[in-house]
Amino acid sequence: MSRIGKLPIKLPPGIKVSIEGNNVTLEGKKGKLFHRLPEFLKVHQQDGSLILENTADSRQSKAMYGLHRSLLNNAVMGVHEGFQKKLEINGIGFRAAVEGKKLVMNLGFSHPVVYEIPEGISVKVQDNTKLTIEGIDKCLVGAVAADIRGFYVPEPYKGKGIRYAGEVIRRKAGKTAQK
């Protein structure tokens, strides 16, 4: 049995849960999320918490037990508090701006890089170089942050590029002149 899967998911006050078969819908102050469970997992609400039950004894079901418990917990946290990722843009002349539902970045290329912001995600820009990505779906927030970082991954010589806040880039010395 999964140690993570057995743990109950505490429901904060103000979270509405509706369970219809294997479909779980969570609604909170930040929004609404939907999660579909596999056939071998059952969920029920008890004493202000959600409890997952594994009805099969296969290796796959044991592996999925903890995964879906974590995904449901992330959904509960998302509709209650939301998630955010912070990115920093380093480089001379590198900047970003939000124009409607598009993020426009100047990253030293001959053209501006335009990224379409998906539904359910908000992007804020501070000082033209600090991005804050917010949303209720943890997977989507992380995927958007990774997509934006992928436009210019930090290079090890000068440290130019887009990186997560607090991320340490290992620097290299570069070539040394020989005489």
UniProtKB/Swiss-Prot annotation:
Gene Ontology molecular function: rRNA binding; structural constituent of ribosome
UniProt entry keywords in alphabetical sequence: Ribonucleoprotein, Ribosomal protein, RNA-binding, rRNA-binding
One cellular component (GO) term of this entry: cytosolic large ribosomal subunit
Pfam families membership: Ribosomal_L6
SUPFAM superfamilies hit by this protein: Ribosomal protein L6
N-terminal signal peptide: none
Function: This protein binds to the 23S rRNA, and is important in its secondary structure. It is located near the subunit interface in the base of the L7/L12 stalk, and near the tRNA binding site of the peptidyltransferase center.
Family: Belongs to the universal ribosomal protein uL6 family.
Subunit structure: Part of the 50S ribosomal subunit.
Identification of the protein by name: Large ribosomal subunit protein uL6
Species whose genome carries this gene: Methylacidiphilum infernorum (isolate V4) (Methylokorus infernorum (strain V4))
